[in-house]
């Protein structure tokens, strides 16, 4: 059986890993063992943060919607409640974009929500009294 020499493969593996680690500070970009540890951690951070990014954006959208809603005299939770009651199916990403870039359209949506909440409030009180 022929002898297998792995030097070429090993060098390619190390070269690839060090290329991945380029841009890291100090030994983490130059020494194989340190670079390997850092690349492994970096991949874990990337994986985790790709999932965290979804929540971060949702949080940002909610803050923008809340600011726009309060500028129009309604709180975030009343706005969302009113939109659900009115049957408006616009997601938070679009609402946040409207709140930032198209204040008139956002104000119209807020009025829809306000009317739905007011109608539900009067309807609910009348049904409880009867």
Curated annotation (Swiss-Prot):
SUPFAM superfamilies: Ribosomal protein L20. This is Large ribosomal subunit protein bL20. It comes from Salinispora arenicola (strain CNS-205). One of its GO terms (cellular component) is ribonucleoprotein complex. NCBIfam families: rplT_bact. GO terms for biological process: ribosomal large subunit assembly; translation. HAMAP family: Ribosomal_bL20 (MF_00382). Belongs to the bacterial ribosomal protein bL20 family. The keyword Electron transport does not apply. Binds directly to 23S ribosomal RNA and is necessary for the in vitro assembly process of the 50S ribosomal subunit. It is not involved in the protein synthesizing functions of that subunit. PROSITE patterns: RIBOSOMAL_L20. Keywords: Ribonucleoprotein, Ribosomal protein, RNA-binding, rRNA-binding. The keyword rRNA-binding applies. GO terms for molecular function: rRNA binding; structural constituent of ribosome.
């Amino acid at each position: 059986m022929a002898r297998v020499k792995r030097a070429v493969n090993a060098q390619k593996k190390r070269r690839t890993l060090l290329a991945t680690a380029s841009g890291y500070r100090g030994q983490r970009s130059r020494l194989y063992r340190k670079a390997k540890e850092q690349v492994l951690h970096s991949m874990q951070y990337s994986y985790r943060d790709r999932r965290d990014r979804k929540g971060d954006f949702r949080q940002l959208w909610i803050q923008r919607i809340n600011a726009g809603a309060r500028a129009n005299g309604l709180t975030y939770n009343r706005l969302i409640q009113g939109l659900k009651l009115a049957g408006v199916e616009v997601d938070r990403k679009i609402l946040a974009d409207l709140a930032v870039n198209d204040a008139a359209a956002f104000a119209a949506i807020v009025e829809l929500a306000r009317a739905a909440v007011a109608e539900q409030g009067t309807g609910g009180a009348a049904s409880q009294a009867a």
